[in-house]
């Protein structure tokens, strides 16, 4: 049973790209903690919605998150192809406390150029949202409510002084678990 209210992280001001990178590193640590093996359960699905105007830094945040999670290659914007998939190596401890690497799928969606709400489904991405891994979705509002509920809504806005305001709202229990990890930092 899920509860009706979930946690938020109070608005945080990002004054530079370095601040965005620092936030991404903090988030990566919590994601890695969340995906650690517990009773051989790696079947977690983590879904983030990124909300904000053009040029606010949604792709920049995603790029820093991917790099903080260990991706070393180029991070392309998925604007024209709807989705860029990545395979991340996540270190984990098994039942004997041995360190092993697990491949974690990461799908970066940009729905800005969609012609209609269910285009992401017609493109064959429905199953991606139920498979273990991470889905990061820019412009989720273009899907007009057809996407699964995001664990986190990450809102970015441009302040008058050109800094960014970052606000995080959890919508699920797993989203709350991530926020509790941030509060423990």
Task: Describe each PLM feature range.
Residues 2-34:
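N-terminal pre-Walker A segment at the start of P-loop NTPase domains
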Residues 30-45:
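Phosphate-binding P-loop
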Residues 43, 71-86:
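Short beta-strand-centered segment that lines the nucleotide-binding/catalytic pocket of NTP-utilizing
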Residues 1-5, 10, 118-185:
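Short phosphate-coordinating micro-motif centered on Lys-Gly-acidic
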Residues 48-50:
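Hydrophobic anchor at the beta1->P-loop junction of P-loop NTPases
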Residues 81-115:
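Switch I (G2) and immediately adjacent beta-strands of P-loop GTPase domains
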Residues 58:
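Conserved lysine of the Walker
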Residues 54:
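The conserved Walker
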């Amino acid at each position: 049973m899920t509860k009706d209210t979930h946690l938020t992280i109070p608005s945080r001001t990002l004054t530079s790209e370095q601040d965005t990178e620092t936030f991404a590193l903090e988030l990566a640590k919590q994601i890695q903690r969340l995906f650690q093996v517990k009773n051989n359960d790696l079947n977690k699905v983590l879904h983030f919605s990124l909300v904000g105007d053009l040029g606010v830094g949604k792709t920049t945040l995603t790029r820093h998150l991917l790099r903080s999670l260990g991706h070393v290659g180029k991070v392309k914007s998925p604007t024209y192809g709807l989705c860029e998939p990545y395979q991340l190596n996540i270190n984990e401890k098994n039942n004997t406390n041995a360190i092993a690497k697990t491949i974690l799928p990461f799908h970066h969606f940009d729905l800005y150029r969609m012609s209609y709400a269910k285009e992401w489904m017609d493109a064959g991405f429905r199953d991606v949202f139920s498979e273990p891994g991470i889905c990061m979705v820019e412009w989720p509002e273009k899907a007009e409510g057809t996407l699964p509920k995001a664990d986190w809504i990450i809102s970015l806005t441009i302040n008058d002084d050109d800094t960014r305001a970052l606000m995080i709202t959890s919508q699920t229990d797993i989203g709350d678990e991530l926020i509790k990890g941030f509060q423990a930092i």
